[in-house]
Amino acid sequence: MESPEGAGPGEITKEVKVPQAAPSVPAHETGDTCHTPVAAVEEEVGIPIPAPGFLQVTERRQPLSSVSSLEVHFDLLDLTELTDMSDQELAEVFADSDDENLATESPAGLHPLSRASCLRSPSWTKTRAEQNREKQTPSDPERQGTIVDTFLTVEEPKED
């Protein structure tokens, strides 16, 4: 039997329409291959049904953020409580990046604070002694009047 596309001008092709069971079920037609079941359903129901195998993008939005694999956001490093900070090399990496931030944040004309007079002390550079001191009871007279700050003043040794 010859296909409908190969039919000559003198030949008659018969098109038979198969009744649909439900509007959501695509109809399968025989005969003309140019007429798709999607178009038949769309004409009857009015809702376009996508052809299988195609992805339809209904909405586009901007990405939430973009960070290159080589770039590390400094604020995210503060979330390293689960990291083993007893590793001295790792603590030095964080301390070095903190020094770079202090140098770049200083406005023109002002000198950054010298390392000898003021140290920035984020949570990842605290020593075990400082952590143990913080675990003391709040009734401790030394702890009552102090306020924890991100900058700690370095006291020079007292001369006797």
From Swiss-Prot:
Could you tell me where the Basic and acidic residues compositional bias lies? 127-143
Determine the domain of life of the protein's source: Eukaryota
A matching Pfam family: Dysbindin
Q: Keywords for this entry?
A: Phosphoprotein
The annotated region (Disordered) lies at 1-34, 95-160
* An individual GO BP term: regulation of signal transduction
Q: Which GO terms of the cellular component aspect does the record hold?
A: cytoplasm
Q: Does the keyword Endoplasmic reticulum apply?
A: no
Modified residues annotated as Phosphoserine in this record: 3, 97, 121
Q: Which family does it belong to?
A: Belongs to the dysbindin family.
Protein name stated in the entry: Dysbindin domain-containing protein 1
Species this protein is from: Rattus norvegicus
